[in-house]
Amino acid sequence: MVVNQPNSQSGKQGRKIVTTRPAFPKAAVAVIATAAIVIAACQVEDSTVTSAAAVINPTRVVITEKVAGSDFPVHLAYVETIDGLYTPIGIRKPEGDGPFPIVLFASGNGGEGMAWVRDATQNRSWTQEQFVKAGYAVVWTRYRAEVELAYANYGQLIEDTRQGRQLLNRGPLEYEDMISIIEFVKTLPYVDPARVGYMGMSHGGEMAFKITSEYDGLRAAIASEPANHEFLALTPDDTAHINPESGLRDIESMLMRETEKVRGRIDLDLAQQRISTIKTPILVQGRNGDELQGIFRVGYDLLQEAGKDAEWKSYEHDVHGFVYVARNAAGVYDPDEVQMQGVNDSIAFFDRYMKP
């Protein structure tokens, strides 16, 4: 989880990475302890629940858990990705058979597996609850961890065969896992495959740009506080540095608030080329005062300049990722007015493209 707090030396807003995973609320622990295991081609292929004695399809096993304080359970599953490895997701949906529009949610960098999905479902799902109440199926997604500069250095994924087996020019990246998830949810019987949306925050917001630049299977997307430095081919300034222990870039303290500064440090021709292939309507959400607000805005500006279907909204809030409302220290959801407005705006955006 990433939050903003004042830097004690400079007084500026800087990002603090909270590395400890929030504990499940007591109520959530109780329901997880009694989670129903659903054997599960049935759960994914159709709406019929079979008994444990039924034939098990190992590629379609789903575990259903209650969500604390909610009437909508989560169906935990694994999706096969390009190279045959599996990535975890958590699906929730309204009552009934659908077909429903569906929105996939992504937050920040990848990794941490099913534990992350379960924790986010129990502790960061107020926003998703509002979507389900508005008639959407929702998915918390996980994907591979970011690979430093792989998107910039190795180009698009190319698939071939060698000795009858799959051959790739590079390993799949996190946004390609997301495309696999998108294609998977389109096969679910309660999902309308023509009404699939995506909402990504921070690195997940950049993934919205990467996905739609190469893939035209989304009806609409939201890029919330998109950390687009790689997509825009931005060269960091001296506010970023190299981590001496890993040799990798540390950009957590990078300051890119001004659009003029950002434009002067990106590869404009390359960024415009990547933007040119986007066909998906995109809402870009900024956050006033964020140290990367210039990056957020330039992503939108380039969409607008290229004549794309794009919208911009910016909000006054202290927390990076404010649109994904988390439980407070007391274990309850208590969204403020700005968070509620951001979520309402997000639902309204998807409604325009994904509701009849």
Task: Locate the predicted segments by residue.
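N-terminal cap/lid segment of alpha/beta-hydrolase-fold proteins
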Residues: 55-97
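C-terminal catalytic histidine-bearing segment of alpha/beta-hydrolase fold enzymes
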Residues: 309-356
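Short glycine-enriched nucleophile-adjacent loop
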Residues: 205-216
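Short beta-strand/loop motif that positions the catalytic acidic residue
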Residues: 278, 284-286
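Mobile cap/lid helix-loop segments that gate and shape the active-site cleft of serine hydrolases
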Residues: 71, 218-274
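Short substrate-entry loop that stabilizes the transition state in hydrolases
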Residues: 98-100, 108-148, 292-293
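Alpha/beta-hydrolase fold nucleophile elbow
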Residues: 191-202
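Alpha/beta-hydrolase active-site loop
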Residues: 156-189
